[in-house]
A protein has these predicted regions:
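N-terminal Lys/Arg-rich, disordered targeting/topogenic segments
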Residues: 1-16
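Hydrophobic membrane-insertion alpha-helices, especially the h-region
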Residues: 17-37
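STAS-typified acidic loop motif
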Residues: 18, 49, 80-111
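Membrane-embedded segments
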Residues: 135-146
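Glycine-rich beta-to-alpha active-site loop
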Residues: 137, 150-188
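Charged, glycine-interspersed solvent-exposed loop segments at helix/strand-loop junctions
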Residues: 191-262
Length: 262
């Protein structure tokens, strides 16, 4: 067919047919980009450990550069990086305060449950200092905190980042002292296996849904999770005291969360 004939044929098509053709072209292009993106996700996920703290990144991440983000944290956390890198430890101190410090490694939830089982009647508050870690363990710890009517706190110059705010959200009363460093970003359920692109996408979606559902059950404002989803894993969205109050991450003594029914 001559170019002029082809042009006439296109012009003679009705608008609906032209729109359908354009749609299928765009759909094909989108599918091609999706395959590329899924392959990149699969490669990235395969390289990540089973934690959302990546070993090649510092525990104290830079602030997100997204428009409207509050910027840098109030202070540098006081704990050395080597302390925060260690698997989470639990230390019961005076006043019924259980200090939870370090990375939320796989198995942290089981150790926490054992601690609560052994000393539950003495534990009134969990004080957090963690760069994050295993999402599944964070959710399990958060649920147990709520079930046992325990409060949570981030102390002055302590760090609660990545999946740590999930634990924080479980407290029946939640406080962040002046200069507490609280940050969120995208979380994922990493694996040592090499998933297919479809498996990587499915895992990311399932983890996202699981965290969103849990935060909703804990009565945390949806805006908090939106900030997390908008922030890449190598950055943090550092929350201001006003934002923590707005999203009900802190209760400020005026709003006490109702314990979950389980």
């Amino acid at each position: 067919m001559k170019p002029s004939s082809a042009l006439k044929a296109v012009i003679s098509m009705d608008d609906g047919l032209l729109m359908r053709g354009a749609f299928y072209v765009l759909l094909a292009a989108a599918a091609a980009f999706l395959v590329i993106d899924l392959r990149e996700i699969s490669t990235a996920e395969a390289a990540r450990p089973a934690l959302d703290v990546m070993p090649n990144l510092p525990t104290f991440l830079p602030a997100t550069t997204a428009p409207g983000a509050p910027g840098s944290p109030p202070v540098q956390p006081s704990s050395p990086e080597e302390v925060l890198r260690k698997p989470m430890t639990f230390n019961l101190v005076s006043g019924g305060v259980l200090r939870a410090e370090g990375t939320i490694d796989p198995g942290a939830a089981d150790r926490f449950a054992s601690e609560v089982e052994a000393r539950g009647e003495y534990i009134k508050l969990v004080s957090l200092n963690s760069p994050g870690g295993s999402v599944d363990d964070a959710i399990a710890m958060s649920k147990l905190i709520r079930e046992r009517n325990i409060a949570t706190k981030v102390a002055e110059k302590a760090l609660c980042a990545s999946s740590c705010p999930i634990i924080f959200a479980g407290g029946v009363a939640r406080s962040a002292e002046k200069d507490a460093v609280v940050g969120v970003h995208q979380v994922f359920n990493g694996s040592i296996e090499r998933p297919s692109p479809e498996q990587a996408m499915s895992s990311a979606q399932a983890t996202t849904a699981r965290v969103a559902r849990h935060l909703d059950e804990m009565d945390i404002g949806a805006g908090l999770w939106i900030h997390a989803l908008e922030t890449p894993p190598n950055q943090l969205y550092y929350l201001t005291p006003a934002e923590m109050s707005k999203y009900r991450l802190t209760t400020d003594g005026t709003h006490v969360a109702v314990p979950s029914a389980g």
